[in-house]
């Protein structure tokens, strides 16, 4: 069951109306009086996923101007960063990348900051609403507004279907790279899972149909498909990649297109 959209206590009529419109756009329910459970909280500042029963967990939002992402953008290693190497950005600029499992959009943002034009697909209306809110606020950011709107686009829908439709478009519109980072079930011993992962798992659960993403991705991409997996996780669809890039916590499996 999807969380309801709500507002803080004593919200202005304008904010209530904004929240109701948001609920309508994403086909979610609005309840201005809810005080328990997992909600989408529309405040004056931003939209956030929040567990009202666990105030210590904090909230999850998309903030492309956050200190963490700003540091990563400015000092994260640029094209030497692992995701950039996996995508194959060395010597390339303005590659088209399709992030078919966008989530909170962090890897998409890093790739966009390096010059890629990134289309993001997100099937969850709740997560898509968070992404849309983050993109909207980025449009008004002095540091981001000059380039981010031209390089990041959001599509809400089922990735397998959208990729299949994309294959029917002219070849010049196909992405150079399809990037996949499906939700993977966390091991039980990982009690200190990051707050957003806890809330995301509560909201979405693991991508049980993730294996079905690989074939349409391989059919669509012009250069390569990159799959981000936890270290030690099986290959997607049990298909061995051409390149494995091992990290401490994650692994990038790279499938080259001949």
UniProtKB/Swiss-Prot annotation:
- Write down the chemical reaction(s) this protein catalyses: guanosine(1516) in 16S rRNA + S-adenosyl-L-methionine = N(2)-methylguanosine(1516) in 16S rRNA + S-adenosyl-L-homocysteine + H(+)
Q: Binding positions for S-adenosyl-L-methionine?
A: 106-107, 122-123, 181
Q: Give its E.C. classification number.
A: 2.1.1.242
Q: Which InterPro entries match?
A: 16SrRNA_methylTrfase_J (IPR007536), SAM-dependent_MTases_sf (IPR029063)
Can the keyword Transferase be found in this entry's annotation?
yes
Q: Which domain of life is it from?
A: Bacteria
Pfam families to which the protein is assigned, alphabetical: SAM_MT
Q: Which UniProt keywords apply?
A: Cytoplasm, Methyltransferase, rRNA processing, S-adenosyl-L-methionine, Transferase
Principal location class: cytoplasm
- Say which enzyme class the record assigns: transferase
Annotated localization? Cytoplasm
User: A Gene Ontology molecular-function term?
Assistant: rRNA (guanine-N2-)-methyltransferase activity
Q: Which GO terms describe its cellular component?
A: cytoplasm
Q: Tell me the function of this protein.
A: Specifically methylates the guanosine in position 1516 of 16S rRNA.
Similarity comment text for this entry: Belongs to the methyltransferase superfamily. RsmJ family.
State the PANTHER family in the record. RIBOSOMAL RNA SMALL SUBUNIT METHYLTRANSFERASE J (PTHR36112:SF1)
Q: What is this protein called?
A: Ribosomal RNA small subunit methyltransferase J
- Organism from which the protein derives: Pseudoalteromonas atlantica (strain T6c / ATCC BAA-1087)
What gene name is listed for this protein? rsmJ
